[in-house]
Amino acid sequence: MVVEKRNPIPVKEAIQRIVNQQSSMPAITVALEKSLNHILAEDIVATYDIPRFDKSPYDGFAIRSVDSQGASGQNRIEFKVIDHIGAGSVSDKLVGDHEAVRIMTGAQIPNGADAVVMFEQTIELEDTFTIRKPFSKNENISLKGEETKTGDVVLKKGQVINPGAIAVLATYGYAEVKVIKQPSVAVIATGSELLDVNDVLEDGKIRNSNGPMIRALAEKLGLEVGIYKTQKDDLDSGIQVVKEAMEKHDIVITTGGVSVGDFDYLPEIYKAVKAEVLFNKVAMRPGSVTTVAFADGKYLFGLSGNPSACFTGFELFVKPAVKHMCGALEVFPQIIKATLMEDFTKANPFTRFIRAKATLTSAGATVVPSGFNKSGAVVAIAHANCMVMLPGGSRGFKAGHTVDIILTESDAAEEELLL
């Protein structure tokens, strides 16, 4: 079914229509060092207990707890040191009555011992030491399997592999990892007014900023990107390049050509490639004419030619589609609360997304609009790390109001907590 009329739908419904499509990428196996930012295709289980053995979390002395009973400031108890081991070494001594093994962090607890005394809790002599407090069984010991046991699920299918997950995979010996193949993306900027970055400016022309921006956004997600030659406002060539892109890529992103002008051909292109239009208008600003279609398991995104609207469309709609195709556990944008630090008095007949700068503090998040915020603005994008989401039907917001924000970058510094 092709949607002919432009009936605006809510942002959340638009995202839901995208993720309702049956589109998934195949599982592949990659080397551990190539797995960053991929999504796991299966659960990862612990291949052994961690710790693998009872070990010391401190530098100190391994003793029998029973020998420490009765120790006090007035009754210091003495121990004789019979061995010295570091991490990776195992003592062959059996700890006996009032004996101890000098032990370093990470070393295996020797036979006979069941507690560790930290160095700072002792008074050391040449080959003996004394303590002034009793220790209980297993005190200051990391017990075998207390973190994970063999067979425990340590990473879930659908989880994004971040540096911490890399550490887990390496710990359990996963030199290769089964992940979901990431989709490839075609980026096609359209408009007879567009010049390439190296071109000399001409009257009535602007440089193509959307193409490089979308490429960067996609590559930031770890996606393979194909850049196509900037397309003039011509229907036949537009159909041809979109067909070519669909043959080679899983996602096709066009910028421009989605409005209602005389040279906006995207609706006709979607008809020509037999794509089902999921929606062609969203109740939001900027980017209300964002159009998304689906054909043969592939997404076609028609993003606005206005830079801020184009950026907003990628964050709200392309990102969830990529996550959905890769089987991610969470696909919807994450929303957090923040305190607005400046007035924003513009009325919002539809949900409005404002480029802004968020700061996470010990008292919570604060946010300030990032300069000029019209849909065609470019500079505000560079200085933003989030989008403020103002609900439709609101008549502006004052400083001090709580608003919803979507983080788009990870540099929302906790000012009071900076080193």
Curated annotation (Swiss-Prot):
Binds 1 Mg(2+) ion per subunit. One of its GO terms (cellular component) is cytosol. Keywords: Magnesium, Metal-binding, Molybdenum, Molybdenum cofactor biosynthesis, Transferase. Its EC number is 2.10.1.1. One of its GO terms (molecular function) is molybdopterin molybdotransferase activity. Pfam families: MoCF_biosynth, MoeA_C, MoeA_N. It catalyses: adenylyl-molybdopterin + molybdate = Mo-molybdopterin + AMP + H(+). Pathway: Cofactor biosynthesis; molybdopterin biosynthesis. Its cofactor is Mg(2+). It is an enzyme of class 2 (transferase). Belongs to the MoeA family. This is Molybdopterin molybdenumtransferase. The keyword Magnesium applies. Catalyzes the insertion of molybdate into adenylated molybdopterin with the concomitant release of AMP. It comes from Staphylococcus aureus (strain Mu50 / ATCC 700699). One of its GO terms (biological process) is Mo-molybdopterin cofactor biosynthetic process.
